[in-house]
Amino acid sequence: MMEPTIHLRQAKVGDIPAILEIEQECFQEDSFSREQFVYLICRSKGTFYVVVEQERMIAYVSLLFHAGTRYLRIYSIAVHPDCRGRKLGQLLMERTIETALECKAAKITRSEEH
């Protein structure tokens, strides 16, 4: 049997329902709203990556460029509980580091909200 293929790509607005599902599974009452994800994907100064396996969204990371600095902030990162232990968080962190290098960030920071 073939192993499922995992893809890492930039998020699209159409991904929001699946992102919300992961968000609610991981953070429950502290989860972000649909409007917050629309902003993060469409209008923020940053980037948003998702991990997809067989057309199912299983993880994401939202990165923001901190205004007035050369800092890249991890705003939110989550892996669906059913998919933990598969190094998906590591994959997202590696992409975060690549993004920081590409944009010549001086530092990677994390949000205190999640």
Go through each PLM region and give its residues.
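Acetyl-CoA-dependent GNAT
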Residues: 10-84, 93-95, 99, 103
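Extreme N-terminal starter segment of soluble prokaryotic enzymes
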Residues: 6-8
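Conserved small/polar residues in nucleotide/adenosyl-binding loops
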Residues: 113-114
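Short acidic/polar active-site loop segments enriched in Thr and Asp
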Residues: 106
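Short, conserved catalytic or adaptor-binding loops enriched in Gly and charged residues
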Residues: 1-3
